[in-house]
């Protein structure tokens, strides 16, 4: 039924005709997410009529039908202004049983009404900044958090739980004040960690899950997304012993998530949200990833269970096949693996054995090939600076932050970006808590080491001499042409002579020489003026 006909029926006020018109409209547009511009004014008129009835109170008998129509029209951005009012939002919050000013409904609420109201609120908060502001002012997050805390005691349908969590996610994603309120005032990390444990159906010390059912997967992903929103700066925050224990408890549940498969084809998506949240944990809490007890069939390395680290590495390999949104795909898992390797020697040595095994092929450039090392070295020259930074950082840590070792595995040309950023172009080693790892060279590498081009990282075929057959006069002529070309480029500032500062940073040659001379003068006691 057309919006104009439905609006006409509403204006007549005849209940049966109105109900039938709304039901017909709902059936026809249940899967409509885009709308015809030609009927925009009719839809806006219908929305205003619905709002007037909503604010006065919907008939209990046909409440679900009215809310379904509101939900459909709330997808239309041209109708948002009508619905995004304080009175409309309050009415929807009351039907969803999350209005802060209302007493809890004594009798069990109508779950169909509650669900439709939640869906309407999700649509409005997603698309309307005004609705976002009003929802924050109405403190809807308080009653939502209360209901999430009741999931252990009261049985709510899957869809109600899912849209409770979806609304929490939208509010925390779009409103900084709601994010802080849930984190601090409502103890959101503890609340949602408990909800995650309930959803997974495991305790931290129990055996890992095998497959998480579809509905539990959907709810778990929403919980992970909300937790990500409210803990995004936890990695930078100093935490006390109580908070550290809570984050470790959360980490053990995330360990279950990493090891579990999701029903259907959502495993990679599920693991993606898990890895995103792992990246928010305080660094000292990542030790839980290596705390899994050894059991039959587990992957042991240096007496430590590496099942979780191996699963994260397998996830990284899958993500490296992505061709779009590479930063979102690989940066989180690379960051988690980097910190695990930096802080835990067994993890670093295990990852190095998998990613940077002893070099044998010395005739292929490090970025060429299908090995994990080759793919990561290719990322070191990616256009996205964040992608190349995390890839280089990961490989650098696997090399125990040793510059010669890093160059050996990646080539100086690929390594130059990180070395320049770290002030290590002249070599050396940054401060770091690393033991002296052995880096055993293969026989193939030792034999070819003297012939390896450090810039490309491989043995280069000897190129032909371009001056072969030239007379001395011709050679001198070509040399002067080259000098003149460089001089012209330099004078027009297309290129600039560079040098190495005493601190290991690339700088202009003139500045580098000045800094070197200043350093020599300051260290020479005889150079002080009289």
From Swiss-Prot:
Pfam families reported for this sequence: Ric8
Transmembrane segments: none
Effect of residue 381 to A: Does not affect ability to fold GNAQ
Annotated consequence of substituting residue 478 to A/K: Reduced ability to promote guanine exchange of G-alpha proteins
Keyword terms, alphabetized: Chaperone, Cytoplasm, Guanine-nucleotide releasing factor, Phosphoprotein
Effect recorded for residue 415 to W: Strongly reduced ability to promote guanine exchange of G-alpha proteins
GO cellular component terms attached to this protein's record: cell cortex; cytoplasm; membrane; plasma membrane
Family statement drawn from the similarity comment of this UniProt entry: Belongs to the synembryn family.
Known partners and oligomeric status: Interacts with GDP-bound G alpha proteins GNAI1, GNAO1 and GNAQ, and with GNA13 with lower affinity. Does not interact with G-alpha proteins when they are in complex with subunits beta and gamma. Interacts (via C-terminus) with RGS14; the interaction stimulates the dissociation of the complex between RGS14 and the active GTP-bound form of GNAI1. Interacts with NCS1; interaction is favored in the absence of Ca(2+) and myristoylation of NCS1 is not required.
PANTHER family hit by this protein: SYNEMBRYN, SYNEMBRYN-A
Protein name (database record): Chaperone Ric-8A
Gene: Ric8a
